[in-house]
Amino acid sequence: MFNTTFANRTLPDLVEIQRASFCWFLNEGLAEEIQSFSPIVNYTGNLELHLFGDQYTLRYPKHNINECKRRDTTYSVQIYVPAQLINRETGVIKEQEVFIGDLPLMTDRGTFIINGAERVIVNQIVRSPGIYYKSELDKQGRRTYSSSLISNRGAWVKFETDRNDLVWVRIDKTRKIPAHVFLKAMGLSDTDIYNGLRHPEYLKKTFRFEGNYTTETALIQMYNKLRPGEPATVTGGQQLLYSRFFDPKRYDLGKVGRYKLNKKLNLSVPENVRVLTPQDTLAAIDYLINLKFEIGETDDIDHLGNRRVRSVGELLQNQVRIGLNRLERIIRERMTICDITSLTPNTLVNPKPIIASIREFFGSSQLSQFMDQTNPLAELTHKRRISALGPGGLNRDRAGFGVRDIHPSHYGRICPIETPEGPNAGLIGVLATHARINTYGFIEAPFFKVQDGQVYNHSQPIYLTADQEDKYRIAPGDITLDETNRIATKIVPIKYRQEFTTTKPNQVDFIAVSPIQVISIATSLIPFLEHDDANRALMGSNMQRQAVPLLYPESPLVGTGLEAQAARDSGMVVVSIEDGQVTFVSGDKICVTNKKGDEIAYYLQKYQRSNQDTCINQRPTVWLGEDVIEGQVIADGAATEGGELALGQNILVAYLPWEGYNYEDAFLINERLVYNDVYTSVHIEKYEIEARQTKLGSEEITRELPNVGEAALRKLDENGIIVIGSWVEAGDILIGKVTPKGESDQPPEGKLLRAIFGEKARDVRDTSLRVPNGGRGRILDVRIFTREKGDELPTGANIVIRVYIAQSRKIQVGDKMAGRHGNKGIISRILPRQDMPYLPDGTPVDLVLNPLGVPSRMNVGQIFECLLGLAAENLNKRFKITPFDEMHGAEASRVLVNEKLNEAKIKTGENWLFDLRHPGKITLYDGRTGEAFDNPVTIGVSYMLKLVHLVDDKIHARSTGPYSLVTQQPLGGRAQHGGQRLGEMEVWALEAFGASYTLQELLTVKSDDMQGRNETLNAIVKGKPIPRPGTPESFKVLMRELQSLGLDIGAYKIENLPDGQTRGIEVDLMMNYQQSRLFKPLYESMQTKNNENLFL
């Protein structure tokens, strides 16, 4: 028997971290913040404004979630707070309910709708407020100790010892103050100080060295150190000390800071005392001195006991505080300026500061991110992400290896596998499967109690923080237990005080609840994970999030058992909220009648566009008359099948080299995958156009376009708008629009006509919305927004039209595919099915992989998966393999795979399925010749994904296009229709080859020699020889930049004189601009047959 009791239960709700935090904000955080600002008193003290934050109300949102997405508005509620204005002179009390701002509301999926787009607030991991001790060796090898007292808000205090054994205090990195001066200034007497220290003799050295002080002289000395140059007084010192450490508005340890301080220094200060107390300071100095005597221990700042998570609620609370601070200043100013008798709470309170603060946070904060909606797993992982970046966090450029590294305290809390590759590695992590966050923001992991080797795994698990866990001996979740739930092995691997070691079963205190509690959701979806190298498992986890939802989803034959919960918690599937019977089913609606006879309607999303342009489409999975139970999946979403996550397809793969087409991780695929739409996905693009009010008149949406033939308008309706259901190709008109044009926009012939006849050619130009290059598909929807309908439009816009185009993309050469084990590659060739290698029963292989991609990458899990998949296909079964199966015996994976292949061989009677001489390998035949390959080949059924990196979105070419204004070189990138950069290394290659004329041409007329460009074009049009290149524009820019630095620098032409002497003549590089008319191509030569102008 094994420790599977809890592992097989469902995991905790995976999006709870977001929802719980936002609920806390609504229930406590918001009220607490508003209360802390009340009352606001004016400078004379005769007016008081009280805000009753605990009685605030929220008004219902104006539109529902779907309507907000359609209209591009924010799904938010209005906050109203009861307020009371008291005039102390007259005793008049005015009461009103005041509006203080809009608050975006979280959807039940843990997201926010901001300006029509779904966004997620990422959890931030920061250093917890509290006190931290560290030791350092100075240059002479002597050990000095220091500690930092970090507050939630306000000054940081640093206590330090030096090589002379003196104790100092630093406030916010200012000058050092002797420790006893600081203690005396805080009001402690000599007796208090000596009684509070275990080693008072150590501090006496500081007394002797710096002299003794009374409270008054200590305050003056402290004021002099902190504010040098200002006249010091005792009152000034007291005010300075109060404002720095005792004013709750300026200094706040926070609930967490007080808890950590009490715990570290063994104090019993009440939790509601959030400011610094003299006991705190004395205890901090006592602990510092004790470290010198080897009592106590220093802290590890990377330990999860010293780092806490700030979720949505707390981040929002901080933002509301910023808004309230601004509001408080405005209220005080209005109390002073306005007539007291006419003042009311509503005239005092301006909601703009809070609205601006919240909008800034949701719109532009580093932690408010556009939700990754590629597939359900991407969505789920994004909500569970933990970032060390952002305001108050780290900077990726300055973060060292220590912060990024895996720490022993991450065990069961933060996944050691799933993190980005590149500059953010280690700074962005994901919560482990069973982890949760406690009220203080520390991450907790669950464990079962163990006593004398007996595991109590039928009771509720105990959640421990990283600090608590250090005190116990903890065994992993994959050790073997006997029938009575006792640990069956003599020696148990354990984690104790940051070390991994072994011990006897009776020494174990706790055991992990499941082998997968160490890793994240995405990583736990990889079968045979324990056989993969961590680097490849990381790629596998990240690439599952990039899988495109396919037209016909198929769940994996070999899974891990977590697919159903991942799909359910992502919110992509529709779940029945009550028991009942299905009374109506259609493509977009399901009705369930519950036991009371009430009908509950569930509306399905049909062909909605996700943030990443993939298609969200829900399909019913229940029949009319079917009985459903609470929590049952009644409709599948994108990339789910039967309520389980289905990111890819099960296809037949073979590991063999094939004519070099799978060199360097390239894939060779069967045309069946194209023709049978196995890897076809639907993508929805959004195009938008505005008709604006211009200085010359308003733009018009119309079918009457200048110089456009009827053929180009055939798909538009009478208003010039594309008809839904039309098929469009690149360059087709979607919305006809004309813009009035001014005199300067007229071409020369138009000016001539007006000069001769005074006739006005139609003075509008065609600015229609067209399908961009590479775009094609079916018109899915057209949405028209006007002010008359009550839609909110951008300033200056009269009408906004959005067109949605759906396109189905089959798999093609250049697309990226990957397995779940980090085995990724690009499709290099699509072979006819008759040419593919085939099995002894004639089945052609779907995908040919390179066997050299396995040994060096050490991701052997893919081999186990493909062989077990082959057995599953032949046995008509599906397997759920929980990672880390060695607890079932040595080489458990190999035994299982061989066993199942043998079983498949017996059941199907196909002897080739399992051969003892080379288990897992099969004689394969070449489809072109029909001959067997020389050696047996590993074949099997693997779960392969098509990733979002599609060649259609990346392929790009340019003939003519835009140039940069400054350097006059072609722009870069597909979005700008840019050119290919000929960089430094390419120049070296041409230099090495000696291709001087080719190089000169590339660096001048093909790039930024403006005069040469035009002359070359002219020469090509007229069929004349190409002229010599001129000076590149970038050279002129360089000259001008050097001249702007005050350097007298110029370009000179060397001329030979008749007497054999030479002289330099300065060349005017700007001459081209003054005589620019000469270099323009002649107008006649630039005419094409259709009388359209050509421009480079």
Curated annotation (Swiss-Prot):
The lineage of its organism: Eukaryota, Cryptophyceae, Pyrenomonadales, Geminigeraceae, Guillardia. One of its GO terms (molecular function) is ribonucleoside binding. Its main location: plastid. NCBIfam families: PRK00405.1 (NF001616), rpoB (TIGR02013). GO terms for cellular component: chloroplast; DNA-directed RNA polymerase complex; mitochondrion. Pfam families: RNA_pol_Rpb2_1 (PF04563), RNA_pol_Rpb2_2 (PF04561), RNA_pol_Rpb2_3 (PF04565), RNA_pol_Rpb2_45 (PF10385), RNA_pol_Rpb2_6 (PF00562), RNA_pol_Rpb2_7 (PF04560). It catalyses: RNA(n) + a ribonucleoside 5'-triphosphate = RNA(n+1) + diphosphate. Coiled coil: none annotated. It is an enzyme of class 2 (transferase). In plastids the minimal PEP RNA polymerase catalytic core is composed of four subunits: alpha, beta, beta', and beta''. When a (nuclear-encoded) sigma factor is associated with the core the holoenzyme is formed, which can initiate transcription. This is DNA-directed RNA polymerase subunit beta. Gene3D superfamilies: 2.40.50.100, 2.40.50.150, 3.90.1100.10, DNA-directed RNA polymerase, beta subunit, external 1 domain, DNA-directed RNA polymerase, subunit 2, domain 6, RNA polymerase alpha subunit dimerisation domain, RNA polymerase Rpb2, domain 2. InterPro entries: DNA-dir_RNA_pol_bsu_ext_1_sf, DNA-dir_RNA_pol_bsu_external_1, DNA-dir_RNA_pol_su2, DNA-dir_RNAP_su2_dom, DNA-dir_RNAP_su2_hyb_sf, RNA_pol_bsu_bac, RNA_pol_bsu_CS, RNA_pol_bsu_protrusion. It is found in: Plastid, Chloroplast. GO terms for biological process: DNA-templated transcription. Its EC number is 2.7.7.6.
